[in-house]
Each structure stands twice: as structure tokens, then as C-alpha cells.
Curated annotation (Swiss-Prot):
Protein name: Alpha-lactalbumin
Species of the source: Trichosurus vulpecula
Recorded GO CC terms: extracellular region
Principal subcellular localization: secreted
Alphabetized GO MF terms: calcium ion binding; lactose synthase activity; lysozyme activity
Length: 140
């Protein structure tokens, strides 16, 4: 029985640091509270997030010579940094690995920086493919 105690403790601690899957209305509320609706149409953004990450914070995708991270699928190609020494040169000033946890506060800050650029949602391929029209299903 004593040998199971360390495994039990690991099982209790690990879920607190693991990723989270959000629902569309939960995300809608969080994004609205953080003022993202002042920057971009939430149905368009939520559709793009769904088709990019499935609303999962742990999504990590290899995309040719860079990776995309987290619920917003933020690219290591200039937006976030894969190495600590590159953080200051990245637009969002964050390690990409920090975009994979269940706290999406820093993800939202980074996404807002990207969304305020002229290309806005066009930085995400899923937006052009799936989220330009018929967005009623993404309302809450």
C-alpha cells in the first residue's frame, strides 16, 4: 500500500497543471470579460479557435518549419519563442510552451496583439477556410 502513495500524490498534482478543453459559450464569456469583443467579432474568432485547436489548450501542431501552440494556435514563427533567449524578440514576449497550460490569460494577451494588426484573423488558415460566413452556430 505504501508504494501506491507516490502514484496517488502524482495523480492529484498533475491534473492541476494539465490542459483544459473549453466550451464555446465558456470561451465567449471569458473573451468578452477580457475585452476581445472590442477588437474582433467573437463568433468569427470562436469559430477560428474551434477549427484550429478544438478549444483545447494543449494543442501543438507542427507546420512545416515552425509550430503552433495552444487554444489560439499561436505560431513560433515570430509570435512566441521556443527558447528563452528569443522571448524578447517575439511579438508577444512569451515562451511558446506557456501557451499550452490551462491558464489562457497570456494566450489572450498575445492573440489580442495579433488581432490588432491589419491582417487580423487572416493569420489563421482556419479563418479563411471555415469562418467567413454562416457564423450563427458560434453565437452564445
Amino acid at each position: 500500500m505504501m508504494s501506491l502513495l507516490p502514484l496517488l500524490l502524482i495523480g492529484i498534482v498533475l491534473p492541476a497543471t494539465q490542459a483544459k478543453d473549453y466550451g464555446k459559450c465558456e470561451l465567449n464569456q471569458i473573451l468578452r470579460e477580457r475585452g476581445v469583443d472590442k477588437v474582433i467579432s467573437l463568433p468569427e474568432l470562436i469559430c477560428t479557435m474551434f477549427h484550429s485547436s478544438g478549444f483545447s489548450t494543449e494543442t501543438e501542431v507542427d507546420n512545416n518549419n515552425h509550430k503552433e501552440y495552444g487554444i489560439f494556435q499561436i505560431s513560433s514563427n515570430g509570435w512566441c519563442a521556443e527558447k528563452q533567449e528569443d522571448v524578447e524578440r517575439s511579438v508577444c514576449g512569451i515562451l511558446c510552451s506557456k501557451l499550452l497550460d490551462d491558464d489562457i490569460t497570456d494566450d489572450i494577451v498575445c492573440a489580442k496583439k495579433i488581432l490588432q494588426l491589419p491582417e487580423r484573423l487572416d493569420h489563421w488558415k482556419a479563418h479563411n477556410t471555415f469562418c467567413r460566413e454562416n457564423l450563427d452556430q458560434w453565437n452564445c
